[in-house]
Amino acid sequence: MNKKELFDAFDGFSQNLMVTLADIEAMKKQVQGLVEENTILRLENTKLRERLSQLEHENLAKTSSKQGKDHLEGIYDEGFHICNFFYGQRRENDEECMFCRELLDRK
């Protein structure tokens, strides 16, 4: 192999290295963009999970409150007082009690 062929081989090898280096830099930028996007999506996912948990907690509180009110309505409909003054006593002739009604009509 003479000197010219040797220099041509080195020149070709050098050009291949430059192309490879450019490809690596492009891949590096792409990976960096993906990492940034992944970080943003992770943060958004965390916030959404927190919000979902908060909504589930609020829904559970509303449900348990409604179930308690429904239970009191059932007791009242069976003919018993649910007010603080006469709780558990039977209502005479299923008469309305303004104290019990006030409890049931609260929001």
Curated annotation (Swiss-Prot):
InterPro entries hit by this protein: YabA (IPR010377)
GO cellular component, one term: nucleoid
Top-level division of the source organism's lineage: Bacteria
GO BP, sorted A to Z: DNA replication
Cofactor(s) of this protein: Zn(2+)
Position of the signal peptide: none
Binding note for cofactor: Binds 1 zinc ion per subunit.
Transmembrane segments: none
Main location: cytoplasm
Record Pfam families: YabA (PF06156)
Keyword match Cytoplasm: yes
Protein's cellular compartments: Cytoplasm, Nucleoid
Keywords: Cytoplasm, DNA replication, DNA replication inhibitor, Metal-binding, Zinc
List of residues binding Zn(2+): 81, 83, 97, 100
Metal-binding is among the record's keywords: yes
Matches recorded under HAMAP family: YabA (MF_01159)
Function statement: Involved in control of chromosome replication initiation. Inhibits the cooperative binding of DnaA to the oriC region, thus negatively regulating initiation of chromosome replication. Inhibits the ability of DnaA-ATP to form a helix on DNA; does not disassemble preformed DnaA-DNA helices. Decreases the residence time of DnaA on the chromosome at its binding sites (oriC, replication forks and promoter-binding sites). Tethers DnaA to the replication machinery via the DNA polymerase beta sliding clamp subunit (dnaN).
Protein family membership: Belongs to the YabA family.
Record's subunit section: Homotetramer. Interacts with both DnaA and DnaN, acting as a bridge between these two proteins.
Name the UniProt record assigns to this protein: Replication initiation control protein YabA
